[in-house]
Amino acid sequence: MTRHPEYQYLDLMSELLETGDRRMDRTGEGTLSLFGKQMRFKLSDGTIPIFTTKKVYWKTSVKEMLWFLTGQTNISSLLRENVRIWTDWPLAKYRKATGETISQEQFEDRIVASDEFASEWGDLGPVYGKQWRRWVDNDGQEHDQIATVISTLKTNPTSRRILFHAWNVGELDRMALHPCHMTYQFHVSWPNGQDGRPQLSMMVHQRSCDIFLGAPFNICQQAVLLAMIAQQVDMDRGELVWLGGDTHLYLNHLDQARLQLSRKPKPFPKLEIKRRPASIDGYTIDDFEVSEYQSHERIEAPVAV
């Protein structure tokens, strides 16, 4: 019997608990860390790796991916979609700059209510979406990396240069958070021969990974991105390959990790994209249907900022 693919994740978390290198980190929380890990997930059977040993809010994950694809960098549009995962960084900046002891809810309400306030305090700098869709080179010219990937997949699918990334050295200092999942590379194969349907796979290099909170969220949205691009270029879904650089478990997540390790995975759900928009920019959250998702209860844990 084939071992459930979620055990790759659980085994990695167990390895971190047993042999992870204890170290202090940028956030001051401290971590157990391992370097250079890999997980592989097959999407060709229609499933999607939404982990089941705790509840993953897949719609929030996909909404963030759709936001990346718009090229936007302000949290205001995310908040209007009830997505609050980026608020911590601009909120911390606001509190430090003003000395105001404002609550997260009050801050978010002001961002949504006032375009002027959102413009001043809600922008994250040139983070993921800006680099994906409007990378600026030395002469000031903008490049749409996503459009280039899709065009190359259609015209030169065997190229070894089909990738995009977000590590723009010249703009790192202006980002609220440096890119964690930074490089996405694509590979086309013909498993049934050159006369058969092409299959699209994607490899993601994540230089830094919060394995408890971040990985389940990122892997879900990366699988959805692969499915979207495969649909846009008329290819079948292949494999998602995930590579972790500094793969870590925060010291204030250890009890939560042990609880999750006590649970057995359930079957992965199915992902259906209900229509094919004219371009990658045409997708909305209503286009995605996840069926047969059964999970254990959610496990809460604090975010390290």
Swiss-Prot record:
It catalyses: dUMP + (6R)-5,10-methylene-5,6,7,8-tetrahydrofolate = 7,8-dihydrofolate + dTMP. One of its GO terms (cellular component) is cytosol. Gene3D superfamilies: Thymidylate synthase/dCMP hydroxymethylase domain. Pathway: Pyrimidine metabolism; dTTP biosynthesis. (6R)-5,10-methylene-5,6,7,8-tetrahydrofolate binds at D210, A304. Keywords: Cytoplasm, Methyltransferase, Nucleotide biosynthesis, Transferase. GO terms for molecular function: thymidylate synthase activity. Homodimer. Belongs to the thymidylate synthase family. Bacterial-type ThyA subfamily. This is Thymidylate synthase.
